[in-house]
């Protein structure tokens, strides 16, 4: 995902530290959900707390966010439009999204997994001739 505020597999704790660091209401980022496989979390800071809203991928690649019960269900063609809508006050979040927290690099989990898989790959230099 090529969004500068998408942090991949950032943990909830790491997310909270990043969002609360500046003490600014409206800091936000998107990360992978730790508890719901395939879901994302839109996390936003407000009054020294972090609020998380789950984002689900619907049919045909659309996105749906879970906000409060009084907000009509809206489906978005992409995450940029979702963020754009919730960047305006009074759209159903505890506070509007005002300050994206940009990632330094994506999560290392995928890279770690790739490295672990590479341990079992052999190169020609690792082969030993076996005599009959």
UniProtKB/Swiss-Prot annotation:
InterPro entries: EAT2_SH2, SH2, SH2_dom_sf. GO terms for molecular function: phosphotyrosine residue binding; signaling adaptor activity. Keywords: Adaptive immunity, Immunity, Innate immunity, Phosphoprotein, SH2 domain. Phosphorylated on tyrosine residues; probably at Tyr-120 and/or Tyr-127. Coiled coil: none annotated. The modification Phosphotyrosine is found at residue 127. PANTHER family: INOSITOL POLYPHOSPHATE-RELATED PHOSPHATASE DOMAIN-CONTAINING PROTEIN (PTHR46051:SF1), SH2 DOMAIN-CONTAINING PROTEIN (PTHR46051). Cytoplasmic adapter regulating receptors of the signaling lymphocytic activation molecule (SLAM) family such as CD84, SLAMF1, LY9 and CD244. In SLAM signaling seems to cooperate with SH2D1A/SAP. Plays a role in regulation of effector functions of natural killer (NK) cells by controlling signal transduction through CD244/2B4. However, conflicting results are reported which may reflect the use of different strain backgrounds. Binds to the phosphorylated receptors CD84, SLAMF1, LY9 and CD244. Does not bind to non-phosphorylated SLAMF1. Interacts with SLAMF7 (via ITSM phosphorylated on 'Tyr-302'). Interacts with Src kinases HCK, LYN, FYN, FGR and LCK (via kinase domains). Interacts (phosphorylated at Tyr-127) with PLCG2. This is SH2 domain-containing protein 1B. It comes from Mus musculus (Mouse).
